[in-house]
Amino acid sequence: MSKEIKFSSDARSAMVRGVDILADTVKVTLGPKGRNVVLEKSFGSPLITNDGVTIAKEIELEDHFENMGAKLVSEVASKTNDIAGDGTTTATVLTQAIVREGIKNVTAGANPIGIRRGIETAVAAAVEALKNNAIPVANKEAIAQVAAVSSRSEKVGEYISEAMEKVGKDGVITIEESRGMETELEVVEGMQFDRGYLSQYMVTDSEKMVADLENPYILITDKKISNIQEILPLLESILQSNRPLLIIADDVDGEALPTLVLNKIRGTFNVVAVKAPGFGDRRKAMLEDIAILTGGTVITEDLGLELKDATIEALGQAARVTVDKDSTVIVEGAGNPEAISNRVAVIKSQIETTTSEFDREKLQERLAKLSGGVAVIKVGAATETELKEMKLRIEDALNATRAAVEEGIVAGGGTALANVIPAVATLELTGDEATGRNIVLRALEEPVRQIAHNAGFEGSIVIDRLKNAELGIGFNAATGEWVNMIDQGIIDPVKVSRSALQNAASVASLILTTEAVVANKPEPVAPAPAMDPSMMGGMM
């Protein structure tokens, strides 16, 4: 395919047009009075949303050069979403502001490399000032505030803070669609995995069809148990202790399963068998997690262990285990707290180093199961369109809350970015680097200007007053009042503001230093073939 190439100002101008088209579409959603954007979907009803990254991903422009500019801004939104989970619209607004001011100076003859150095220095100073202004988020009320601001719903704020209190900041909180119209929170304590009993005759409550084991021993192995003789010595030891047994194995079949069921029905002992969770290497890791949580040992050939030699000391223990036809929940495992902490640290380091989004998700699930449990927020709504929009809002709120717990909070509504302007202004830079600093100074005002504009106020008047206000005092665009933003619960996580600024500066600098753009040349549309004259006989 042949290529089309543009150079210097032509290349940058085309990309800037794309930046402006995407940013102008996204920035109308910023702030408490931001508008919605309707996205056409190939199937089903349109999606109505105010989520910046969702809108950015949907935009495809016909002009290849403009589309590249739009895609670079979309990348800023996606990257900010990946790191902080929120702040995608702020990142888009900042990118547009830096690009717009930067292009003016580059066109006037400034050196883009010098400008880039100035931008990087100014952003580093702004980030440092943001961190210095941070307030730690420690209690349930502060967590609820952050979530309520992001989701624009106090009820959602309560659900998220309650979920984080129950499962911890490392716990898994999933968002699912409810069957009804109400949004509700469901918490599963302990370690849960998606494997149920191998025989319904193992249940202890035939009405609920669940097996409840109090203070059980837990046999953990990656082997298949087909011959009951392999575990007979172990079963005899457990029989003497008069405690129930949970068997987690690759499978239990052959004569072993009916023998266990028969002894359960006769009341000889209480036993439940389930298949091991996961597959392949992930299965081995999950079995090791269960062993550490319960204080047991995985009976595996990798460690040179055989089932027939296993003793009661190799078994794990827990306060309670509940098994239904689809899942198993282990509550209060008897594992060594130090060993569990070490395992958690190992999984955290794996999360940081993995490049696969799927692997990261699975590692976070394992981390949550070791840390204390899983919370599920079931989202309910009257229509499918409302449900999709609400689900996106709750996902943003959850991510923002996690970011707040991690790095603290600052005044929201763009106030925090305006508050760091003095720290950036004091940087002593010269020439084009000073120009880069001034570009960042102007960009830091832009979120406040846009929030005010979306609420029907004059942005320049608001920013002028904000520059002279005390730290933390800001403009509440929802009411039109000047208030202490922290006291009013109008807050942003530091991680969100920091990531938005850093990612915006990074991509904007790349656009400013672009000298040539190569795009695919549009293929000429082939003319429709002429109709065969012999087929026109009946038309005369």
Curated annotation (Swiss-Prot):
Binding site for ATP: T29, L30, G31, P32, D86, G87, T88, T89, T90, G413, N476, A477, A478, D492
InterPro entries per record: Chaperonin_Cpn60_CS (IPR018370), Cpn60/GroEL (IPR001844), Cpn60/GroEL/TCP-1 (IPR002423), GroEL-like_apical_dom_sf (IPR027409), GROEL-like_equatorial_sf (IPR027413), TCP-1-like_intermed_sf (IPR027410)
GO biological process, one term: protein refolding
GO MF annotations, alphabetized: ATP binding; ATP-dependent protein folding chaperone; isomerase activity; unfolded protein binding
Main location: cytoplasm
Keywords associated with the record: ATP-binding, Chaperone, Cytoplasm, Isomerase, Nucleotide-binding
Domain of life: Bacteria
Gene Ontology annotations for the cellular component aspect, listed alphabetically: cytoplasm
Compartments where located: Cytoplasm
Subunit structure: Forms a cylinder of 14 subunits composed of two heptameric rings stacked back-to-back. Interacts with the co-chaperonin GroES.
Function in brief: Together with its co-chaperonin GroES, plays an essential role in assisting protein folding. The GroEL-GroES system forms a nano-cage that allows encapsulation of the non-native substrate proteins and provides a physical environment optimized to promote and accelerate protein folding.
Family: Belongs to the chaperonin (HSP60) family.
Protein name in the entry: Chaperonin GroEL
Gene name tied to this protein: groEL
